[in-house]
Curated annotation (Swiss-Prot):
A Pfam family per the record: ClpS
Database matches in InterPro entries: ClpS, ClpS_core, Ribosomal_bL12_C/ClpS-like
One BP annotation, GO: proteolysis
Function as written in the Swiss-Prot or TrEMBL entry: Involved in the modulation of the specificity of the ClpAP-mediated ATP-dependent protein degradation.
UniProt source species: Syntrophus aciditrophicus (strain SB)
Name of the protein described by the UniProt record: ATP-dependent Clp protease adapter protein ClpS
Domain of life: Bacteria
Subunit structure: Binds to the N-terminal domain of the chaperone ClpA.
Family designation: Belongs to the ClpS family.
Length: 107
């Protein structure tokens, strides 16, 4: 009696299939907050602490980058996580009537 691995090998050989064992790392994306003239600094810090789980000091530093440089990097994530975090930022901003924008760009 053949074990499962042998059965799969024989099946693959009959169909002339070659398998490659290549594991690729997922693409990573930077999540970026953009400055505007209406969103308060306190709200940006709250977003960074709530959604991105940043400690207060780091959240404040990122908020100051957003304020002074026009944008700040919140973190680097896989596509699905980055998309979810962006949607959460936009939802929370909308709920609080702020025009805060967030985007991602591939690392």
């Amino acid at each position: 009696m053949q074990n499962e691995t042998d059965v799969i090998k024989n099946f693959d050989q009959e169909l002339n299939i070659e398998w490659e064992d290549k594991v690729m790392e997922p693409r990573m994306y930077r999540v970026i907050l953009h400055n505007d003239h209406y969103t308060t600094m306190d709200f940006v810090v709250q977003i960074l602490m709530t959604i991105f789980h940043k400690p207060a000091a780091q959240a404040t530093r990122i908020m100051l980058d957003v304020h002074r440089k026009g944008q700040g990097v919140c973190g680097v994530y896989t596509y699905d996580i980055a998309s979810t975090k962006i949607a959460q930022v936009h939802f929370m901003a909308r709920q609080n009537e702020y025009p805060l924008r967030c985007s991602m760009d591939e690392v």
